[in-house]
Curated annotation (Swiss-Prot):
Gene Ontology CC: cytoplasm
EC number(s) reported in the record: 3.1.1.96
CDD domains assigned to the protein according to its UniProt record, in alphabetical order: Dtyr_deacylase
Domain-level remarks: A Gly-cisPro motif from one monomer fits into the active site of the other monomer to allow specific chiral rejection of L-amino acids.
GO biological process, alphabetically ordered: D-amino acid catabolic process
Gene Ontology MF term list: D-tyrosyl-tRNA(Tyr) deacylase activity; Gly-tRNA(Ala) deacylase activity; Ser(Gly)-tRNA(Ala) hydrolase activity; tRNA binding
Pfam families registered for this protein in UniProt: Tyr_Deacylase
Natural source organism: Xanthomonas oryzae pv. oryzae (strain KACC10331 / KXO85)
Name the record gives this protein: D-aminoacyl-tRNA deacylase
HAMAP family (UniProt xref): Deacylase_Dtd
Function: An aminoacyl-tRNA editing enzyme that deacylates mischarged D-aminoacyl-tRNAs. Also deacylates mischarged glycyl-tRNA(Ala), protecting cells against glycine mischarging by AlaRS. Acts via tRNA-based rather than protein-based catalysis; rejects L-amino acids rather than detecting D-amino acids in the active site. By recycling D-aminoacyl-tRNA to D-amino acids and free tRNA molecules, this enzyme counteracts the toxicity associated with the formation of D-aminoacyl-tRNA entities in vivo and helps enforce protein L-homochirality.
InterPro entries, per the entry: Daa-tRNA_deacyls_DTD, DTD-like_sf
Amino acid sequence: MLALIQRVTRASVTVDDRIVGQIGPGLLALIGVEPGDRDAQTRRLAERLLSYRVFSDDAGKMNRSLTDTNGGLLLVSQFTLAADTSSGNRPGFSTAAPPEEAERAFNQLVDICREKHRGGVETGRFGAHMVVDLVNDGPVTFLLRP
């Protein structure tokens, strides 16, 4: 399981011309699920999403987490994140979890984050074609693994 996180001033996800999830200041996390990801990895990634320090403190250092700032979290499933891009000119998707497995893991991640984060957790729609709109703050972008 992996997450591409971006610190944002705002972000939203639109499906069929309707906004299905949106946040103000916080984190947008694109989530890729890989075959064999287990519950422990999902719990660990949730913990990292909420506690990873990417927000500035009073001294300007990245020393505050999403939990510290009470910012929004927008979780978006993205199977292409788990693609194999090691050779050729076209991605391979055998390194991404099958849809049923990925949806279960993604939903578990959402549930854990909603349980632990009072700042609000929004999502896109699993398996849908989504338009993601964001304003990256920094830019600040990190690739996280459990």
